[in-house]
Amino acid sequence: SEITRPMAPGHFNAIFLSDCDALELPMIGTSDIHQPIQTDIDFARGQHRTMTFVFVRERSAEGIREALLHRRTAVYMDEKVIAEEQWLKELFEKSIDIEDIKRNEKSIVITLKNNSDLTFHLKKTRHNPGLVYFREYTIQPQCRHRIEIRLENNIQGGDINFEITNLYAAPNKGLTYSYKV
């Protein structure tokens, strides 16, 4: 069985994610296609086969072996990345640069730059109600994105909190991420 075998819409085969954790196995994504690949995947629209990201320390066969033995892998399918939390957090932080922060008494505007070829879907989570910002954001690959935060009730700053809904470290739960403003 495969970790990414189709399940109910928006889900992946979570039992195998738990098995990887319990058995201390690296996560490996594959695709099992028996007909020409173009019948299932539309490359012209940016679709891709399921694949494995291997986070190596050196670009060599030994570097790949060492990363697999230490479970530094992620599965990439559709727009989802499935991995241990530490690798997802590092992937996100290395992908997104904060290019600019503009602040005045009533608002903060953060300009982000996504330097990767991945799309990130952010959903606002529990936060200080004096920080007012949109509920959901999509940060496209190789693009800039602005997050505008209104400051209400004499709030000077705090944490903006998100779930990155397409980065999975646990079944059906995206990576939680906070940024101090």
Predicted segments with their positions:
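Domain-core and long-helix interface of multi-subunit machines
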Residues: 1-43
